[in-house]
Amino acid sequence: MENNYEVIVIGSGLSGLSIAYILAKNGFKVAVLEKNAQFGGCLQSFKREGVTFETGMHYVGSIEEGQILHKYFNYLSILDDIELSSLNKSCYDIIDFREERYSYANGHENFVETLSQKFPYNVNDIKEYVKAIHNVTENSPYYSFKNFDTLNILDPAHVKTSINEYISQITKNEALQNVLTGNIPLYAGLKDKTPLYIHALISDFYINSAYRIVGSSDNIAKS
């Protein structure tokens, strides 16, 4: 390899490829090093008996026009090279709890309305939850592209408060508590340890919209 690069990025996952692209777009000579035969990190996919399986990115959120991932992918020139397929907006995810199935719906009002059908006596609790996680994301500069001039970009309360602690404060309904935290396996969270901040960013991300990458997630890396 010629030794005339200004920047060497180690690892070809989504973060590595993104930073390499941004640096190259701004005039730097960049090389990306990957130890494995296939690049892409958790964007990789594999096939078994003709069926494609993603290793990490099974579906994406907030990718409709004006939403955060759409802005990122547009800047990274990814959108023209991938095809998106919308998940069911009335049920983009299902939480199974005690032999009952609960649907997560896209859109804040739709999310509240759908869960309220299962928890008619906890409508205000669900509204409070949706409002809270949306407020957290709106105050995150990485999510909203606002408040970059603020020295303290994280509200200590959102970082120190666990998901379980917060949700226990807004509702005493045990079933609802479990349903609202039912997406924890999506990001390997722990109810008593994972901060509200992390849960809010991920949950609101998918409530806004949810799509799968047609073909497989490695199309993002190939773009």
Language-model-detected regions and their locations in the chain:
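A short mid-domain helix/strand-loop element embedded in enzyme catalytic domains
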Residues: 69, 194-198
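N-terminal glycine-rich phosphate/pyrophosphate-binding loop and immediately adjacent elements
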Residues: 2-131
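Short, glycine/acidic-rich beta->alpha junctions
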Residues: 15, 159, 216, 220
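Helical element adjacent to the flavin cofactor pocket in flavoenzyme catalytic cores
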Residues: 200-223
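Hydrophobic (often cysteine-bearing) scaffold residues that line and stabilize catalytic clefts
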Residues: 65, 163, 217-221
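Generic, well-ordered alpha-helical scaffold segments in large soluble proteins
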Residues: 26, 169-170, 223
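Rossmann-like flavin
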Residues: 98-195
